[in-house]
């Protein structure tokens, strides 16, 4: 069904695509996606009504392309959600785990990652007994790894970022206290997620990481992510002129 939807969209047959997309959302059993698809259908119906009445709208072509782009996004997200819900394996397990117990927010994870270096330094200074110090340091590393793994997982299986998610992710990227290796792991998760489901906000994040971060490991990881996404999601990128412009600007400085 997903392939049929994409074929309809490629041929600019939005009405047929939306009918199939509604059925796909039913399989995914996700009320939020169903609501967004219904809203898209309503907007498209109004646009058709105004056109049938002969009403002039200089923004109609722009609106149509926005609707088309949104339909592609919803199709990708719905199919990914359906696979997570009905599939097997690690990602299926994580999807259900996060449905039962919501993960920490990006802001909460940022605070934990920032505290790691400080707590590690304090343990080295304040715990005099070597055995106790080793035990304390080991616990800190285990706790830190738990948060890094959670960060990787919530990004990897996310179908899209909200503005709030992007803001939280940028907090981690911009923090002077979060270790560069942690940010590099985060960027790897963003790249894997983008290869599966294109997300304009995640791609913006990669471009920002490449343009602004001071650590080589982060910049190189972001550049790899940009290149892989541009290759695997070439067709989706063409729907976003602003991202193409930002990408071209980034490539000038390579």
Short names for language-model regions:
Residues 253-254:
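Conserved small/polar residues in nucleotide/adenosyl-binding loops
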Residues 1-129, 142-143:
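Extended, helix-rich scaffolding/adaptor regions
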Residues 116-183, 187-208, 234-235:
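Alpha-helical solenoid scaffolds in large eukaryotic transport, assembly, and signaling factors
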Residues 204-205, 237-250:
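Alpha-helical repeat scaffolds
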Residues 48-54, 231-240:
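Alpha-helical linker/edge segments of TPR/alpha-solenoid repeat scaffolds
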Residues 214-215:
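Short inter-helical turns and helix N-cap capping residues of alpha-solenoid HEAT/ARM repeat scaffolds
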């Amino acid at each position: 069904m997903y392939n049929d939807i994409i074929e309809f969209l490629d041929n600019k047959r939005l009405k047929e695509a939306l009918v199939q997309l509604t059925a796909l959302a039913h399989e995914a059993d996700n009320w939020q996606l169903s609501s967004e698809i219904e809203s898209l259908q309503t907007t498209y119906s109004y646009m058709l009504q105004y056109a049938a009445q002969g009403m002039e709208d200089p923004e109609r072509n722009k609106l149509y392309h926005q609707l088309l782009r949104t339909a592609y996004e919803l199709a990708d997200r719905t199919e990914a959600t359906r696979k997570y819900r009905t599939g097997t394996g690690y990602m299926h397990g994580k999807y259900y785990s996060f449905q039962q117990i919501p993960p920490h927010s990006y802001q909460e994870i940022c605070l934990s990652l920032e505290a790691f270096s400080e707590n590690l330094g304090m343990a080295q200074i304040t715990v005099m007994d070597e055995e106790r110090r080793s035990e304390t340091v080991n616990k800190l590393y285990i706790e830190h790894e738990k948060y890094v793994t959670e960060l990787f997982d919530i990004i990897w299986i996310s179908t899209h970022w909200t503005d709030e998610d992007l803001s939280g992710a940028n907090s981690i990227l911009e923090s002077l206290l979060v270790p560069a290796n942690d940010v590099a792991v985060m960027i790897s998760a963003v790249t894997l997620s983008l290869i599966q489901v294109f997300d304009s906000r995640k791609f913006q994040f990669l471009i920002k990481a490449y343009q602004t971060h001071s650590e080589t490991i982060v910049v190189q990881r972001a550049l790899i992510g940009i290149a892989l996404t541009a290759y695997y999601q070439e067709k989706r990128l063409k729907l976003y002129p602003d991202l193409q412009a930002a990408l071209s600007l980034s490539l000038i400085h390579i």
